[in-house]
Every structure is written in structure tokens, then in C-alpha cells.
Amino acid sequence: MPFLNDLLEQTRRDASSSAALNAENCHPRAIVETHQRSEDTLQSRFRFDVAAVMQVVRNEVLGQDEALQAIEDVLTVVRADILDPRRPLFTALFLGPTGVGKTEVVRALARALHGDADAYCRVDMNTLAQEHYAAALTGAPPGYAGAKEGRTLFDQALLDGSQGRPGIVLFDELEKASKEVSQALLNVFDNGLLRLASGEKSFNFRNTLVFMTSNLAADEIRQHRLGPLASLRRLLGLQAARRERLPGLVRRRLVKRFSAEFVNRIDSTVVFNAIEQEVGERIVELEVSRLNRRLAKHHCRLQLDAAVVGKLASEGHDLEFGARALKRFIRHELEVPLAEYLLGNRIPCRAEVTCMTVAGHLERGRIRFSLPT
């Protein structure tokens, strides 16, 4: 029966968590003996392939090698299951300009771990700009309507994740929430639990990867990589020295916006770079591959020549607005003309052909399409 299977699965998770807590109180010699009894196989609550997960993430998020390496390091430690079992698995703050892939990393992780890009709990912090909106996280206080129900924005099933794979929660655009809302997360960072204001229940984050995104210090990050003097600094070999100063600049901006105790509880602050023009062609190719997945239901696929890819990458690049601006340009210059072409031309049905290739090429500076003869 389904409910018995769910109960059994929950019992297994509770047993794994209890074992992790008990391991912390064991003598080191007992831990070594436990590992020896496992016949050189590390016993872990988690069963996922770090390399396979990162391959998916790297295919989806381009131009952020340093940030993705930091995430891979974290997943390696999580997979080994050697983290403090009384805290969330990991808390990270993603900083960078808009449109550089901060949220896309979380979606790619959810897809790689759980098979669904939406298999994570997302809290849009820009909707919690007023201090009384902290109730959306901690529930209504005792005596208020809905206190006993304990309704919040969290879903414990998403926080728990799936069997052998951690859950994911994203607090998006953290800087737009009121200070009271962000302070409500301190207990989550400390011991992995969020007790509701009513005291009726708690949400457990101890099996969860906690991510936050923010555009704070975006100007400093952009100037560091692509400012007017960036090329000169690279030429003179001064880029490394400026890179060393960047974490200090970012930290000062964080402390101005958030309390020191809040910043001090974040495990890692990951800086995302502005999207450089050299990455543009790879982003275009990624978007075309996604478009081809959507075109599969029409039994056709799109193939662009190098000139079209170069045109989209160069003319669609926008330093300030990142990949989103490029995607809008692709929508206007490629997807709209392609849709008009598909509606105005007969595409052979499945009985006539398995998959038809639509070729895209430049003609007098505009993208044109044609079917093979």
C-alpha cells in the first residue's frame, strides 16, 4: 500500500539521520572499525554520481568555471557524508550580476539529482519585503488565524529530497527581503531546523542544500572582470592582485546589508562572473539544442550555419543584462522567424519522414530557413 511504502521510506530516512547523529558521539576507534566492517566501501546516506551531476550542470551553465568548481567540491563532501548532521548539508550565497546563471545552477542541480528542474523548494524573497512577511517562513504566531495549520512557503518533501539524494531550497533575490525575514533563517543555518512561531511543528533542513542568490556587489564583480581597466590589468599582470581584493569588497557589501551574525553563518559565498562575449556562441548552441528538443514534437530539427551562430552571439551580447538579453535576442531574431516559416510551410508528417532538418543561413544580413531538396 502506498502509505505503508511512504512510512517505510520515512523510517529509513529517520534511521539514517539518527545513525549520523550517533556517529558524532562515537569514539574515533569505533568509527574506524565501522569503516573496516564495510569492506572498504564508504557507508553514506547519499547515492549519487558527483561527476554525472556536474556534467549536467556544466552543460547548462556556461562561463562560470570557478563557481561550478566550488559547487563540485561541496557535492563531493556531501556524497562522502562527513558533514555535521546537525546543520544543513551546505549553505551558499550566489553573488553576481543579473543573467549570469545563479538560479540556473540550482535548476540544473535539481534536474541532475532528481530528474526535474523544478524539484526544489523556491522562496521568492522579493515578495517578503515587509517585516511582517516573516510569517510566510515561520507561520502565524499563536492566536492568529492559521497558527495551528502551520502554513508556510516550505514543502518538507522537497526539503528531504529523494532516496539517496539531498533536497534543495533556494532563497531567490535575498537582498530584497526585509531584515526580519532574513534573520528568521539564522536557526536554519545553525541547527538545520526552523520551528514555527506557533510551536506546532518544525521544518527539517538537515538533508538539504540551501542556496541563496543576490545581486549585491554586482557592479564590483562586473568591473573586476570586464571594467574599462580590466584588459590593462591583465596585460600588466595585476588581475590576480585585484582578484584577491574582491572577496573583501564583497564581504563589506554583505555586512552593510545583512547582520554580521547572518553573514558569518553562510558556509560559502560564490561569485559569478559577468558573461563574456567569448561564451556567447556556446550559449547560442545551448539554446538551439533546447529549441530542438521542443521541435521534436513537430518531427523536425534546426541546424544553423556558423555565420548565424556568430551573428546571434555578437549582436545579442549585453554586458549589463547577461544571458537573458541574449535569449531575448534569440527569441526575436531566430524563434519568431522560424515560427513564421513553420506555419507558412508544410512540414512532412511522421509517416513521410522520421525527422526533417530545417537549415538556417544568412541572406542579406537576415536569417532565412530552407528545407532540403
Predicted features along the sequence, with ranges:
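Dynamic helix-loop-helix/coil hinge segments at AAA+ ATPase domain boundaries and subdomain interfaces
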Residues: R37-A70, L128-E131, Y144, A274, ...
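AAA+/P-loop NTPase substrate/partner-engagement loops
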Residues: A112-G143
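Conserved C-terminal "switch" segment of AAA+ ATPases
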Residues: E39-R47, E60-V61, A117-D118, D219-G310
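C-terminal engagement/docking regions of AAA+ P-loop ATPases
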Residues: P2-E24, T98-V100, E104-R107, F321-T373
